[in-house]
């Protein structure tokens, strides 16, 4: 009877040891699986009609030997990134590849780096991230104004780069319907009002009560296809 109990106890302890070993291995596999091969892409500011290089930089390698992402605008495939180590060693964080954007033929707006494939040294698939970025045209803004007694009148002009203007060579054109905020510097920049640009790119004048001479500047708000911009300051 005593020997039977000892055998049963040994079997029970052995069973626990086996279960414990499996649990540890599962945790390690889970840790590896939780790593996501990741890319980052900087926003693109379009100010010419030339082809733009859009670098995609690896931020988490996770032991991958290859990884690729599609550059999508909505469902439309524009370009892609492909990173490969050569097959013998894993990729390193900081490695990058180039995608391309053609301003005169491709849409502006929100873009996505969409996962395509990533493999480890055993050629098993690894999870990947998606990354959102924007490609928009640059804006320019200038401010002008004058003083009349205790009032200052300021207005702004906004232009934007149009890659399709000038027979596809691109040029700066008036930017209509843009919201512009005006600021006065009195112990820091304080917003004093807003106007919207017309067809000629100009806003109407904004009247500001200001007995003392102060500095003014203007900021044009971003749109889905235009970047924001702030003017230099003027004193009136």
Range-by-range predicted roles:
Residues 2-4, 19-80, 85-236:
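Low-complexity, Ser/Thr/Pro-rich intrinsically disordered linker/stalk segments at domain junctions
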Residues 10-20:
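Bacterial N-terminal signal peptides
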Residues 1-11:
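Bacterial N-terminal signal peptides that target proteins for export
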């Amino acid at each position: 009877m005593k020997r039977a109990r000892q055998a049963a106890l040994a079997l029970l302890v052995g069973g626990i040891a086996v279960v414990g070993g499996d649990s540890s291995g599962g945790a390690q596999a889970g840790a590896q699986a939780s790593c996501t091969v990741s890319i980052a892409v900087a926003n693109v500011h379009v100010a010419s009609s030339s082809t733009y290089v859009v670098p995609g930089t690896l931020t988490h390698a996770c032991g991958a030997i290859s990884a690729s992402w599609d550059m999508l605008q909505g469902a439309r495939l524009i370009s892609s990134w492909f990173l490969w180590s050569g097959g013998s060693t894993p990729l390193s964080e900081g490695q990058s590849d180039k995608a391309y954007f053609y301003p005169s033929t491709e849409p502006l707006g929100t873009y996505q780096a969409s996962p395509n494939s990533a493999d480890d040294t055993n050629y098993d698939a690894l999870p990947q991230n998606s990354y959102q970025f924007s490609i928009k045209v640059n804006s320019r803004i200038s401010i002008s104004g004058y003083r009349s007694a205790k009032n200052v009148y300021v207005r702004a002009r906004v232009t934007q780069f149009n890659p399709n203007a000038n027979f596809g060579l691109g040029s700066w054109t008036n930017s209509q319907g843009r919201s512009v905020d005006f600021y006065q510097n009195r112990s820091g920049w304080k917003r004093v009002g807003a106007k919207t640009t017309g067809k000629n790119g100009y806003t109407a004048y904004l009247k500001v009560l200001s007995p003392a001479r102060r500095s003014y500047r203007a900021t044009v708000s971003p749109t889905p296809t235009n970047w924001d911009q702030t003017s230099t300051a003027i004193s009136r």
